[in-house]
Structure formats: C-alpha cells, structure tokens
C-alpha cells in the first residue's frame, strides 16, 4: 500500500487517481499507524514552504516520517521534494526535514536569461545525470523524456544527491535521492505516460 500524506496542502485527487490507474493500492491519510503500515510513502505539496512545514509539524508526523524512511521508500513531489531539504530561503529562512543535504532558493535570483518567466510552468526535458541512468526510479524512463513543472523555487547545492535536471537557462534540479528518500520537483501525476511509468517504478522499489 502507498500512503499519500494528507497534511492540508494541495489537491491530492490527481495523484491518487494516477496511482489507482496503475492498479496500485493507495491511501490518503494523516494517520501514523497507516503510514507505518504502508510499503511506500508519498509526500505531496503545493504552496509556501513555511506554511507547509508548519502544517506537517502540526500533524505530529515529522518523527514518523524520519523513522519510516530508514526502511521504506518515500517520494516527495514538488513542494514535498523541497521539504526534504535542510533549509529553504522562501520568504525568509525556514528549516526543512533535513533528509537530503541542500537548500531551496528563489529561481528568479539565479536565472541567466531575464526573459524567462517565474514560475517555471510547463513541459521540460528531463536530463538524467550521467551514471544515474540505472537508478531504479528510471527503470521505465529514457533520458530526455519530458515532464511537467510548476514552481518558483528550486533545490541547489545538492549535486551529490541529484539524479536529473532540466535546463531553464540554468540546470534546475528535477529529481534527487538520498538512500530510500526520493524527490521530484516536477509532477509525475501531471507528466503523462512518462510520469506514470516513474510512479510505477517507485512503487516497485
């Protein structure tokens, strides 16, 4: 069973629907016992980092998540991926879950092409880091496939844990990994067949 953590941030319907379309047992929950019973965990999220982190802490699930990722796979999606990092500079300075080394910073501050818009919205090519092609998350993914992004902040100073990136005048971190903890800045559930294949690969970890 895949537990989708519901902590009041974002619409979880499309993610749950995508997983169910693959025939995967899914449960949207904020119950610690259900998360402990799950085989896999997904941490979704849209919106502001500080608000999301506060809501996640209010559920009491932070210690549960940190315990469970020691022996089962977790996938953070979009803001959920950003929460995995140590710190975010989104309208201030905020502490994250600290499951992946690195920081989350404003995309607009680093873009080399001022004509590019922020948020970064739409399809972009996912370039897998050389040597990472055989990661289990990419079991059904070919280098250069396109995925769907919607974000204004991005993870940086995390090269050792980066699996893939997309070009947006700078390399934008697209997927990360630390042990059993995975994250995608893009939305697999909005990335068509490519995203579905990646979700299937995650479910097989």
Predicted regions and their residues:
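Cysteine-nucleophile active-site neighborhood
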Residues: 49-121
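N-terminal beta1-alpha1 ligand-phosphate binding loop
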Residues: 2-24, 189-190
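Amide-donor transfer/coupling interface in amidating biosynthetic enzymes
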Residues: 103-205
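Generic structural signal for residues in well-ordered beta-strands
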Residues: 26-28, 104
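An anion/phosphate-binding loop that grips the pyrophosphate of nucleotide cofactors and donors
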Residues: 38
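Structural alpha-helical scaffold elements that stabilize or flank donor/cofactor-binding regions
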Residues: 34-35, 68, 175
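Structural motif
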Residues: 42-44
